[in-house]
Amino acid sequence: MKCILIAVLCAGILSCSPRPVAGARTDNKADGGYRFERNGWIYVHLEGAPERLGYQHDYLLADEIRELLRVVGPFLEHTTKRDWNFYRNAAEKILWPKIDAEYQRELDGIVEGLAARNVKADRWDIVALNAIEELPGYYVPWLDKQQGKQASAQAPGNCSAFIATGSYTKDKRIVMGHNAWTDYVVGSRWNIMFDLKPEKGERLLMDGLPGVIVSDDDFTVNSAGIMATETTITGFEGFDPNGKPEFMRARKAMQYSKSIDDFAAIMLDGNNGGYANDWLVGNNHTGEIALFENGLKNHSLHRTKDGYFVGSNFPVDDKLRLEETHFDPNNKQNSANARRARWEQLMAQNRGKIDVETGKQMESDSYDIIEKKAGPNERSLCGMVDQSPRGVPDWDWGRFFPGGTVQAKVIDGSMAEKMEIWAAIGHPCGPDFVAERFLAEHHEYEWARGLLRDMKTQPWTYFRIGEQRGQ
């Protein structure tokens, strides 16, 4: 029946991958997986043991993985002054030995699927791709410091997120929202909606990148009622090469958590400091929400059943800020602080009214609280730095850098029960990004020609687990 399902889907879906390949096994590991496309998203269902999850992942997304690998190496070489072989070597020497066997099997399953689809990539390509956040922005500056060099990269400061409960929401239950800020090279390809049904642990619904086993920006709900998202900590400095990769800990935390305490404990087990985040976590069964700030030396956990937490890339704990970042909390005009001020304003204005629709509006908010007018720019919750003559120096984003909000997601308690998400690709606050027009206006980014691609603004779109095309 599963084979028939895949065949039917392929007949009606543009660019549907699975398809027969030479030498495929009779017990095809791709069985059970399927994909369809909707409003810029590629919905992918994966199920089974780790190696099957990995094989299905690549078998269904081979073209997208090939394309992401094509652009990410040149992009990182320009922005971090390290070539792709550097990242492959770090994946092999620094990360692989600390990855749990379950996820090693899944990653190797992706590699096996790549071979079946004639994509030339190996284990170290895929591990490096999964570490696309923690290696460039955390390992690289740490290594520079160890070698007595000036840091060639900085930790990123991307995303705007909130979580609210109790008297702040319309139905007194949890509402959570997030929009992902990143460069448009990678961000325009951050368009996968994964329905992940592993052999062990909880089922997951999450957005993500092709070839990557964790949401990574992050927005996930699991079948135990745990929902989580995050924003990175601007100016963070620190990395422990003896720790476990963040991408593995984040995936494991969502797959095996049944409580907020579970989530924090898994993230702290073997913490390497990579991709240091302020995590916004909710327990749909209790209505409790938490802000878990996860640095390397410092961490804190704030929780409530009546209130909210917001994230826009500012450190919350003063001790962490002073010991592990160079963040300036007094610069009211920088991106993180301006967006924080706007968050506080919106949460006060919408107390008792926050629901999914309000969440969509807030994640699409383009107001610049400093200039007191609509943006979007680097200081609006939904941002377009390609429209800003200031850029974001804290993130090494120059004037008119091609980066900003690339997609957004919202969920509430009733949706979490059924494992549903509303999501929108592109700028929910602005027009399409047209690569050729941008490059014609900004010759300083000519190096990104062939890496940047158009990114169309798409409508908010509903997804749920087990969904089929047309449902």
Annotate each predicted stretch with a short phrase.
Residues M1-L5:
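Positively charged n-region of N-terminal signal peptides that target proteins for export
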Residues V21-C159, T169-D171, V185, G201-E202, ...:
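C-terminus-biased signal that marks the final domain/tail of proteins
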Residues L14-S15:
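C-terminal motif of bacterial Sec signal peptides marking the signal peptidase cleavage site
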Residues A164-G166, K170-I260, A265, V310-S312:
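Active-site rim segments in enzyme catalytic domains, especially the processed small/beta chain
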